[in-house]
């Protein structure tokens, strides 16, 4: 007997409920026009990398725990003397999530991490890029449950970019609201 294939909770919710809600709201001519999540990119820049070259590796380990996937170490493209950065010097880590891992991360972000952010008043509804992608920043990476607070020697911020197939910001905003993103009023 074949086992049932695992499907993330938010993906199931998208297929069963969110697609229908988006179709009713925007009345698309074709079912393929309904926007969906494409990918989530998480970037963690480590400014202290100029002083200690081990910092990006530690940040990458934390990012791997958060994302559930090994990140790539980002390197400086060119030298900037003012920042004491040399070309090819490791300066951060980033990871691109797609498929099931993307939906799992989104579920943890919206339901666990964002409510744990200090003085959180909602996400800025203007943080869209004009092409249906949403960007946000988190100042402390310890809001994620995978990070053990006692073992953290330094806190890093991170940028989270949610890429959708929506063509306008209004469509993307409606899609993310259906995914329970807590936008500011």
Curated annotation (Swiss-Prot):
<keyword id="KW-0699">rRNA-binding</keyword>
<comment type="similarity">
    <text>Belongs to the universal ribosomal protein uL5 family.</text>
</comment>
<protein>
    <recommendedName>
        <fullName>Large ribosomal subunit protein uL5</fullName>
    </recommendedName>
</protein>
<dbReference type="GO" id="GO:1990904">
    <property type="term" value="C:ribonucleoprotein complex"/>
</dbReference>
<keyword id="KW-0689">Ribosomal protein</keyword>
<dbReference type="InterPro" id="IPR031310">
    <property type="entry name" value="Ribosomal_uL5_N"/>
</dbReference>
<dbReference type="GO" id="GO:0003735">
    <property type="term" value="F:structural constituent of ribosome"/>
</dbReference>
<comment type="function">
    <text>This is one of the proteins that bind and probably mediate the attachment of the 5S RNA into the large ribosomal subunit, where it forms part of the central protuberance. In the 70S ribosome it contacts protein S13 of the 30S subunit (bridge B1b), connecting the 2 subunits; this bridge is implicated in subunit movement. Contacts the P site tRNA; the 5S rRNA and some of its associated proteins might help stabilize positioning of ribosome-bound tRNAs.</text>
</comment>
<dbReference type="InterPro" id="IPR020930">
    <property type="entry name" value="Ribosomal_uL5_bac-type"/>
</dbReference>
<keyword id="KW-0694">RNA-binding</keyword>
<dbReference type="InterPro" id="IPR022803">
    <property type="entry name" value="Ribosomal_uL5_dom_sf"/>
</dbReference>
<keyword id="KW-0820">tRNA-binding</keyword>
<dbReference type="Pfam" id="PF00281">
    <property type="entry name" value="Ribosomal_L5"/>
</dbReference>
<dbReference type="InterPro" id="IPR031309">
    <property type="entry name" value="Ribosomal_uL5_C"/>
</dbReference>
<keyword id="KW-0687">Ribonucleoprotein</keyword>
<dbReference type="InterPro" id="IPR020929">
    <property type="entry name" value="Ribosomal_uL5_CS"/>
</dbReference>
<dbReference type="Pfam" id="PF00673">
    <property type="entry name" value="Ribosomal_L5_C"/>
</dbReference>
<dbReference type="GO" id="GO:0006412">
    <property type="term" value="P:translation"/>
</dbReference>
<comment type="subunit">
    <text>Part of the 50S ribosomal subunit; part of the 5S rRNA/L5/L18/L25 subcomplex. Contacts the 5S rRNA and the P site tRNA. Forms a bridge to the 30S subunit in the 70S ribosome.</text>
</comment>
<dbReference type="GO" id="GO:0005840">
    <property type="term" value="C:ribosome"/>
</dbReference>
<dbReference type="InterPro" id="IPR002132">
    <property type="entry name" value="Ribosomal_uL5"/>
</dbReference>
<dbReference type="GO" id="GO:0000049">
    <property type="term" value="F:tRNA binding"/>
</dbReference>
<dbReference type="GO" id="GO:0019843">
    <property type="term" value="F:rRNA binding"/>
</dbReference>
């Amino acid at each position: 007997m074949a086992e049932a294939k695992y499907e993330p909770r938010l993906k199931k919710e998208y297929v069963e409920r969110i697609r229908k809600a988006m179709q009713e709201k925007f009345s698309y001519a074709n079912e393929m026009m309904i926007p969906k999540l494409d990918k989530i990119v998480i970037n963690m820049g480590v400014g202290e990398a100029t002083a200690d070259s081990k910092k990006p590796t530690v940040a990458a380990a934390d990012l791997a725990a958060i994302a559930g996937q090994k990140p790539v170490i980002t390197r400086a493209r060119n030298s900037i003397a003012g920042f004491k950065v040399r070309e090819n010097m490791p300066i951060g880590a980033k990871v691109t999530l797609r498929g099931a891992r993307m939906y799992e991360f989104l579920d943890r972000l919206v339901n666990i991490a964002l409510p744990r952010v200090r003085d959180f008043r909602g996400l800025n509804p203007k943080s869209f890029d004009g092409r249906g992608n949403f960007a946000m920043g988190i100042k402390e990476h310890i809001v994620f449950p995978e990070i053990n607070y006692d073992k953290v020697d330094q806190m890093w911020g991170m940028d989270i970019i949610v890429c959708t197939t929506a063509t306008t910001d209004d469509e993307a905003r409606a899609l993310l609201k259906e995914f329970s993103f807590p936008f500011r009023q």
